[in-house]
Structures are given as structure tokens and as C-alpha cells.
């Protein structure tokens, strides 16, 4: 058996298990030869090409490798896997199980006094859709999350703005280059009172990490929505950047993961809320 490590969209379960068995010494009658980088690296570095490609200089050329490499940040992981033999260390199967998600169901959420609403908007990368979610702090300090809707982008932004007019709306976090600038402009023109955040990549990474941390830490609550459960119980991690950050993909072919992304953004806004500063008037 030979080949490259599994990619983020091809789990390669048999290959992964065989490697683990041999490297751990549990398989006595098999050997393993590997040319790979231990960490995510600069795939455009020719020195690393020679360290990880034994056929380079004979049947493989530098020109061939150079032509295969991508230019964007998102291609970095795949380039490392395909050309530097990088093995992704996190579990590329389901990131959140159905049982883990159902453990957080609540039937009658009680809102905190003077509660604030935090909205997350995600423009899908794989489909022409946009999803909206909301998060709010409960009376017991848990964070309640809810998926509001996922609609085609062509339906325009009026339906989103309708929710943002809520008098308790505090912040809306909008992610997705496909429409965040237009939505920001529409919100401002509609004179909605809520703060608008267009998160940086580092903040999206933080939002996803915090969502899972609080989910597994029993801080998140939800109302058992079938569409949201389907998205969350069929998700997998996708690497973002070079620092171990992750986002989400769906393990179901043709499925939209933006509902989960929107929920994670809304939760992030709520979890980081410090409360309104009281105005002090001195005479």
C-alpha cells in the first residue's frame, strides 16, 4: 500500500488505522516508510520538496510540483498533504455527535433580566444561501442558541433585517465575503441599532473553538431543531490557517453547513458580551 495522507474530504480510515498500527508497533509483520513534514509548513519551499518527495529529480520535477500548488491560504492544507506528506492530527470524521448535541436540549428556556440578543449571519461558501442564528444568555448563565432560517441569497436581506429590528438586538456578526458588505450597508440604511461585526479569520477560528469548548463544557442549550441537529451531527473539521484553527464542512454530499457556522458566530458574540456600561452623569 502506498499513497498520500488522507485529505480533509477523504477520511481514508483504513490507511490511517494501518499507519497507527505499524508506528505503534502493534503490527509486527509490516513496515512503514514515510517522507513527511511533522507540522503544517510552507509548501512553496523547494527544500521541503526534496525532503518529502523521493522521486524528485528522477520522474518528478520542480516545475511539476510548482504547477500543482495553490496560491490561496485555503489551499495550504491540501498542498501540505499532497506534496509534503502532512498527516492531519485532528479527527476528520464527525466533530460533534448526535448524542452530544441532544444532551444540551432544554424545553423551557428562561431568559435573564434585560437580556440581549446576538445574531450570527453566515453566507455559505458551497451554496448560494445565507443562514441566520441567534444566541441569548439564560437566567442560569447558560447560553441558548437557535437557528432562525437558511434562505437563498436571491431573497435579499429584508428578512434578516426584520429580526435585527428587535429592541433587544445588541450585535450581529456577519461572515462570508459573498454578501457581508452588502448586508452591512443594508443594515445601516435601515437604521438598525445593533452593532455590526465583520469578523477576521482569527475571530472566526476563535468562535468555532469556543463553541465546541462550551458545548462539551455543558454551557450551551438549544430547543432541538431538526435542521440544526442534522447540520451539527454531520459536520467535520476543516483546517483554517496554520495555527491549528478549524472551521466546518458537512460530511453529507451537497449539504449546507452554514446553519452551524451562524450558530457558532451568534454564540461567540453572546459569550464575549461584557454588558452595557452604565452612564454616569456628574453635576
Residue ranges and their predicted role:
Residues 27-45, 185-276, 281-283:
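Metal-dependent DNA phosphodiester-chemistry modules and their immediately adjacent helices/loops
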Residues 7-13, 41-43, 90-93, 125-129, ...:
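Flexible loop/turn segments at secondary-structure boundaries
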Residues 1-9, 77-86, 115-116, 255-271:
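P-loop NTPase catalytic cores that bind/hydrolyze ATP
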Residues 1-60, 155, 164, 182-191, ...:
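ASCE P-loop NTPase helicase motor core
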Residues 116-134:
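An active-site-proximal beta-strand-loop segment
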Residues 102-110, 128-178:
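Nucleic-acid-processing active sites and adjacent nucleic-acid-binding tracks
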Residues 35-120:
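ATPase catalytic-site recognition across NTP-hydrolyzing enzymes
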Residues 3-4, 36-39, 83-85, 122-123, ...:
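Active-site proximal loops enriched in glycine and acidic residues that flank catalytic Cys/His/Asp
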